[in-house]
Amino acid sequence: MAVGPTEGKQPPSESFSPTHHQIIAPSPILAVPTLAFSAAQVEIVCKTLEDSGDIERLARFLWSLPVALPNMHEILNCEAVLRARAVVAYHVGNFRELYAIIENHKFTKASYGKLQAMWLEAHYIEAEKLRGRSLGPVDKYRVRKKFPLPPTIWDGEQKTHCFKERTRSLLREWYLQDPYPNPTKKRELAKATGLNPTQVGNWFKNRRQRDRAAAAKNRIQHSQNSSGMGCRSRRADGAASPTPSDSSDSDISLGTHSPVPSSLQLQHSPGSTSNGANDREESLSVDDDKPRDLSGSLPLPLSLPLPLASPTHTPPQLPPGYGGGAGAGPGGPLTGPGCLPPFKLDAATSLFSAGCYLQSFSNLKEMSQQFPIQPIVLRPHPQLPQSLALNGASGGPPLHHPAYAAAYSVECVPGGHGPPHPPPKLRINSPEKLNSTAVAAAASVGGGGGNQHHEPTTTGYHHSGQLMLHRPFSTSPELKHSAPEIT
């Protein structure tokens, strides 16, 4: 016996009236209604729901899409659908699916901003969960370096100074045309670069400030370079200009700087034109064997040091009868006859007295190396008796003693008889000959006055009042009562 009614057959023992409804079992294919949406319609719906921010409805819509549709592959590869799926995965916390969607599909530049933000924020959230704290700027920078943007949502253009290189190049072009754009140009430039007018104005302000600083720095460098070139040119001119030290190798005359007699002109040999210092020193040698006329032409600094050459100082005078009395009056000129101290002139001292030194600071080093200045030592000599001083005191013996004449080669004739004689010509021998001959003269003349004791003084004057000047390191004999040297 049949339990239930068979399909298409009436039960044999029961009859149904025609008014009864037939029960039809539903087909499993027709259980869910089919959505006849095209790919364009699905894209529009996804964009609308994404822009509205209703993520739940967007998620339900994506879930309701049929899988067996013939155009399902085209719908799933649509950029709007992929972006909607990425937004839903980000909001539900399914970051693995978000990374897969972004890395495996190429997007256009219109989707770069949103997808880049979701990529970075997803990595920030994961890093915060791992570290258990919020991330700082440095931590976020490290995350960005560890997980760079994939090329599917990034064109590879680096950001420099907060702007892309393309934006900066466009701003530079506009800046070269007009560094002070008006608001209208700022708006146009902002529209062309994708920035706002405030950003454009700030960039122009910063660029103008940088240019002003660079211009000031360039001006300082230019002034320094010009001053350096001027110094070098002045040095070159100073080296090329004729100076008394290197003007002419044939004949160097010192008479143009100070009244030095022509007998002290530095004679150069014809072959002394080499550039070496030794040749120059040889060419500046002075003949020591010729008598020289040193009367009245030596400048004051050669005769006395600076403290003794003051106008208020009265130098020691000659006896009234010597040399016709020229320059012997009190307060008379120091350059008169007979006031020449016994010291030796060398090339360096002659150049110094002639004013060849310190012509300019540019050749100071070269001149000091070629002609070193030797100091003059003031040393009293009590071994010379009072009668043998060159400018002896009045009442002493005459100056024509044969031993004295042999020591100093002075042609001395007592004054006061006959016409005045020319100033004496002094031949200056070496310190050894001078001192030894002078000591012999003192022994022959002083004779019994050897026991006479002369008290040493601390000044540069001899006990007779005459200033004695000698070359340094002279070979004068050591005396018991000699005064200390004054340099």
Curated annotation (Swiss-Prot):
InterPro entries membership: HD, Homeodomain-like_sf, SIX1_SD
Reported tissue expression: Expressed during early development of the head. First expressed in a band around the anterior end of stage 5 blastoderm embryo, at 93% to 85% egg length. By gastrula stage, site of expression shifts to the dorsal-anterior region. At stage 12, expression is found in the clypeolabrum, the stomodaeum, and in ectoderm dorsal to the future supraesophageal ganglion.
Gly residues bias locations: 321-330
Signal peptide interval: none
DNA-binding interval(s): 154-214
GO terms for MF: DNA-binding transcription factor activity, RNA polymerase II-specific; RNA polymerase II cis-regulatory region sequence-specific DNA binding; sequence-specific DNA binding
Compositional bias of kind Polar residues: 255-277
Pfam annotation, one family: SIX1_SD
GTP-binding in keyword set: no
Region (Disordered): 182-330, 443-463
UniProt function note: May be involved in head or eye development; development of the clypeolabrum and several head sensory organs.
Protein family membership: Belongs to the SIX/Sine oculis homeobox family.
UniProt name for this protein: Protein Optix
Organism: Drosophila melanogaster
Designated gene of the protein: Optix
